[in-house]
Amino acid sequence: MVAASILPVTIHNGNIYFLFGKENELEDSSKGFSDFGGKVENGESIINTAFREGSEELCGFLGNSKDVKQLIKKQGGIYKLSHNNYHIHIFFMNYDENLPKYFTNNHRFLWNHMDKNLLNNSKFFEKQEIKWFSINELRTKKHEFRSFYVEIIDLFLKDIKRITEFINKMKTSRKIYPTSKNKRSKTYKNKKGG
């Protein structure tokens, strides 16, 4: 199975933070935090999967898939990491300390007032909580993440210097920037499709 995701990253008080979402209580396969993604649907590009899944799993808090694409373009582009057939699209986002609170409160309200079968069968409400994690928290709180995602966290930690360089460059420009596999990450100004 090929899958793709988005992962917002920011700098706050000089520290890097990644925004992750926690699977809802009905998830049986692997509980815990991860990024915002899922499997590529038939005929869909990897990058469009990332936009769609990101907008769905964030319940529109960053907008629909077109809005997510525009946000990423506005912020300067992506840094892409791949692990097996899982493609992570990291992008810079301005820090918003209230975003996790608003998302979680909204989820809790809807979760308590809607039919659980409807929620379980929906593409929405997959995440019950979102949270900013610092680099240090990624090292010390791996146990809070989905089991398959721990290897991906190790990949982030191994590549943190280049991710930091990417974030700093994307804050000021929209240049193409190489990823950890010596391929080029493309901004959406320079690339169509996925």
Residue ranges and their predicted role:
Residues 8-10, 20, 90-94, 131-134:
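Short, well-ordered beta-strand micro-motif
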